[in-house]
Amino acid sequence: MNQYFTYILQCSDKTLYCGYTTDLEKRLATHNSGKGAKYTKTRLPVKLLASVDFDNKNDAMSCEWWFKHKLVRKQKLSLIKNDLIKEKFIEYLELKQKKNIHLK
């Protein structure tokens, strides 16, 4: 079974980048080689701030989307600083699952 990671990088200009992958070390190296995401290419080097592993791709992608679209920078930095990323991702997935059950 594959393992998936949602990861958060800090770019050289102090901005944050969030993505998902199956190989965290390789993806970080790809970003830092300038062959990663378009966003990070001009903001090298990047540094890994946090990562959370998941058993399935959908959960990793959902948490990436939530981090990018539902949190403001201050919230993102607070979760990272207080080591609450995994806890909040799990809460988000549980809430998402409850909503899906009620919609069916």
Curated annotation (Swiss-Prot):
Domain (GIY-YIG): residue spans on this chain: 2-79
Gene it is expressed from: ysiG
CDD domains the record matches: GIY-YIG_UPF0213 (cd10456)
InterPro entries for this protein: GIY-YIG_endonuc, GIY-YIG_endonuc_sf, UPF0213_domain
PROSITE patterns tied to this protein: GIY_YIG
Protein origin, superkingdom: Bacteria
Family: Belongs to the UPF0213 family.
Lineage of producing organism: Bacteria, Bacillati, Bacillota, Bacilli, Lactobacillales
Species of the source: Lactococcus lactis subsp. lactis (strain IL1403)
Regions crossing the membrane: none
Protein name per its UniProtKB record: UPF0213 protein YsiG
